A protein has these predicted regions:
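Catalytic phosphate/metal-binding cores of nucleic-acid and nucleotide-processing enzymes, i.e., regions
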Residues: 169-176
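A polyanion-binding, active-site-adjacent surface
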Residues: 1-149, 155-169, 185-198
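Active-site-adjacent alpha-helix of alpha/beta-hydrolase-fold enzymes
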Residues: 178-181
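Short, intrinsically disordered, charge-balanced linker/junction segments flanking boundaries
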Residues: 201-203
Length: 203
C-alpha cells in the first residue's frame, strides 16, 4: 500500500466532517523512512490547495508562512527556501513553487501530515470524536512511511494518538511509545505552534 491509496478514504471523511466547498489536505514529504513525521491537527481554508479548483499537490501549509518560519528557525529548511516563501503572497504560490517547497521537505527527510484531514473554513477546534475517525488512517500512513520519530502538536492530537491524557507542558523532552503493526515508534508531544511558537524538543 502507498500513502496515495489513502486519499479516497480521506475524501469520504471530508464530505462528512469538512467544509463542503473545500477539499481534503493530505500530507507531503519523504515517504521512505523519514527522520521525522510531524503530525498537526487539521487543515484550514487558508491552505491554497484546499480550493476545489486546485489541481496541484494537496499538502499541509501551502500558501502560509508561520510554520515555515518555525521550520527555518530549527534548521529544517534552508535559508534560500525560507526567503522565497517569505517573499510570496498566498496567490503567488503556483504548482511549481509548492512542489519546490516539498522537494526541500523530502530532501531533508521530513514528512508533514495532519491527524484530521477534514479542511475547515477557519481554525475552529474539532471535537475528539471527529479526530478519532482519522486515527486508523493515520496509523496506516505511519506504517507505510516508517518514520524514525514522530512529533505530535498540542495536547489534543498527542492525547488521541497516544490514547492517554497528555499535557505537553509536563512532557518537555520526553517521549512515549506507540506500536503499529509490530513496529514501535517514539512519539514526542510538543506545543502547538501558534504564531512564532517553538518546538520544546532538542534537535
Amino acid at each position: 500500500m502507498k500513502v496515495e491509496d489513502l486519499k479516497k478514504d480521506y475524501d469520504k471523511l471530508q464530505i462528512k466532517y469538512g467544509a463542503k466547498n473545500l477539499d481534503s489536505i493530505y500530507n507531503g514529504g519523504c515517504e521512505d523512512n523519514p527522520d521525522i513525521c510531524f503530525v498537526f491537527m487539521n487543515p484550514t481554508g487558508r491552505n491554497i490547495a484546499s480550493d476545489k479548483s486546485w489541481e496541484g499537490r494537496k499538502s499541509p501549509w501551502l500558501g502560509t508562512k508561520n510554520i515555515w518560519k518555525l521550520f527555518y528557525k530549527v534548521n529544517l529548511i534552508s535559508e534560500d527556501v525560507f526567503n522565497k516563501i517569505q517573499e510570496k503572497k498566498p496567490k503567488d504560490w503556483d504548482y511549481e513553487f509548492c512542489d519546490y517547497v516539498y522537494e526541500e521537505i523530502t530532501n531533508k527527510k521530513l514528512f508533514i501530515t495532519n491527524l484530521g484531514k477534514c479542511t475547515q473554513i477557519d481554525a475552529r477546534p474539532l471535537p475528539d470524536e471527529v479526530l478519532k475517525k482519522y486515527l486508523d488512517l493515520l496509523f496506516k500512513e505511519i506504517d507505510i512511511i516508517r518514520p524514525k520519530i514522530i512529533i505530535t502538536f498540542g495536547n489534543q492530537v498527542s492525547s488521541i494518538i497516544l490514547n492517554k491524557k497528555i499535557a505537553v507542558s509536563e512532557n518537555r523532552k520526553k517521549y512515549h511509545e506507540i506500536e503499529i503493526n509490530q513496529n514501535t515508534y517514539k512519539v514526542y508531544p510538543v506545543y502547538y505552534p501558534v504564531g512564532n511558537g517553538i518546538f520544546n524538543i532538542d534537535k
